[in-house]
């Protein structure tokens, strides 16, 4: 307001408003502090967006807690969302589906062993699924194997077709990364790749029980569907991939970011690697999103 009346002295301006000069200066100092804090937050979020292009606002709020503590910033979740919106940093997720499952084959199909069962620790249940990844001239096919308890990606492979040999490569990687001695179930859809002789034999050679969906419903394998969606929609879709070699190199980096940095609601906003290695206890979550109490002396 003072800028609109430059001819009025500061002393007179303060008298008209009934405030002291100290109060006037304090007001502008506070505005400057708020502006500086907001710019710090925006810059930090932009940096995180380079690594996690479409990570949701709630998970960003969780990842930003150490930053808020370091800079003694006090901001609530809703205020952060408003700041993200004002700076064009909220994201809208795209949805598209291409079917990758062919269950019309003569290979043996196995029953669903996990209808009413949920793992109580890492490497008791692995879930597998395939999704597509677009490149400049064709679709590639991404096979992932994920630990259902920790949500850690154990094995992955990208290929130019849906031949069973490629899903077997993902399984071999998962077996190399196995670190806990426990009985293990492998759960997948009834696609030809997972029923193939080589794939089934590799599971049996490693004493892994075989479980499969029964009616093609994604709800029979929700964790695998979810993790595939995260890797594809939150990461790979935001790069202009040229070929399989480039996609595989990028995927290695993306999986590391996912395993070591990205928090999950379903594991109490911890990272998959932390839960997997330390066998942390997690609460299975259903329904509405929940955010645990985050200790930050600078927030309400």
Model region roles, listed by residue range:
Residues 1-12, 17:
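Double-stranded DNA-binding cores of transcription factors and transposases
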Residues 8-9, 55, 75, 242:
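Residue-level signal for the short linker/turn that defines the boundary of a DNA-recognition helix
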Residues 14, 24, 45, 60, ...:
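Mobile genetic element proteins and their domesticated derivatives, centered on retroelements
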Residues 14, 21-122, 271-280:
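Basic, flexible linker segments flanking DNA-binding modules
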Residues 74-144, 166-170, 177-184, 289, ...:
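Mobile-element integrase/transposase regions
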Residues 101-103, 188-190, 196-200, 210-232, ...:
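RNase H-like two-metal-ion nuclease catalytic core shared by retroviral integrases
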Residues 147-148, 158-163:
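A short acidic/small-residue loop/turn micro-motif
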Residues 204-208, 230-300:
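C-terminal domain-tail junction helix/linker
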